[in-house]
Structures are given as structure tokens and as C-alpha cells.
Amino acid sequence: MYQALYRKYRPQTFSDVVGQKSVTDTLRAQLETGKLSHAYLFTGTRGTGKTSCAKILAKAVNCENPNHGAPCGLCPSCRAIDEGSCMDVLEIDAASNNGVDSVRVLRDDAIYTPGTVKMRVYIIDEVHMLSTAAFNALLKIIEEPPAHLLFILATTELQKVPATILSRCQRFAFKRLRPDEIASRLNFIAYQEHIEIEPEAINLLARLADGGMRDGVSLLCAQAMETIEKQYMLSLIHISEPTRRVVI
């Protein structure tokens, strides 16, 4: 079954995250010292690593064998979170769950201790989409959270998040990625996937990505799919091509 490249190559640990060293270094230091906030707010344009870092942080706080603040990726907790089967680490899309009732359900469930991991983690993506009533309900649990609870909020529109929420979160700004940072990652993915692509094409995709790694990988995927489909059709008639070549 084909897997989108941006999912296949999503960062699994802090060292995999491109272009956000100040963020990842600070998070690792907090994890090593145990000086974690109860609520984080990740801000920045789309595709800069906010959700990926949120998931890595969720693994790190629950990892059974952490290494200098980084999750091992191998223990049962890490694997369950990676597979999306951990019921105590929940990712919520505020764009489609923006009402007060959704947040009240979250708030009611948050009081229970986690069943299989150390901390219950709520990752709320595009948090700026919550209604005013939903923000007020969220504020009540963020103000006095249980010790076993961690909130990680992510937004592309910081100005729409109420000041009452901002003041109770530790904020991290994710910067737009440079074209050379994106190009380096695209070259790595192309090599791993046996996609033969001209350097000029990689550089063009990196510029078109406009600072977002996810868009860059999606563009690479879209260009490669044309040759993948051709290769599949040729395989049906027993003709093979050794590599996929992408020239823009």
C-alpha cells in the first residue's frame, strides 16, 4: 500500500526536525531536567514542524528509555504513540472540533489518570479555530491542570488566540525554513526512494515550498507519482525501469 512521502518521512525524534534547533534544544533540555511546562503553544506557518514536534514531545514525556531528552522510539509507549493506538495521547483538530461541547468532553476526560503511559497528552492543532466559549472551557483546565496532564497547542494564526490562553502557555515560534534546508531533506528522501532528480529540480521544489517542509515533500511526491504510475504500467507488461527520473 502506497504511503505519502510526507507521512513516511515525518520526523520521529528531535534530531530529525529540520531548521528548528533552538526549539528542539530547549525542549530536550527541559525533558532532561524535568522542568516541563503543563501547556505549550507552538506557533508558525504551516509545514514547519509544529505537529511533528508535538508528537515527539508526547513520546518523550512517556518514553520508558529516553536518551538525553529524546524518545527511544522502540519502547511500547513510543510505538503505541507512533501507531496512533495510545488512548492517552490524543490529537484534536480544532477546525472540525471547535465547539464548547468538544472541549467540555476533553475537560471531563482529563481528570482521569492515564492508563498505559505516564502522562496524558492533548495535542490541539489549529487551536485558533476554537470558539470563544470553547476557549473559555479550555482555560479552566489549563489554569489548574492535573499533574498527569500536558497540553500542546499549535496554531498558524497566533493573533487569534486569546491573551488568557497565551499567558498560561510556554510559547515556541517555529521559523520558516530556508530553501537550502528544504532541498537537503528532499535530496535525502529522493535518494532513499530511488528517485533520480536533477539538482535544479530539487532547488525549484524547495523554493516553491515557500518555507514549509511538508509542502516541499508533497511537491516531490506529486512529481514522482507521474513516473511511479508509468513504471507500474510497464511492469504489467513485464518491462522494468531501474529508477524514477524527475526533471522539471
Question: PLM features: residue spans?
Answer:
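Extended, largely alpha-helical regulatory/partner-binding modules appended to the mid-to-C-terminal parts
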Residues: 23, 76, 80-87, 105, ...
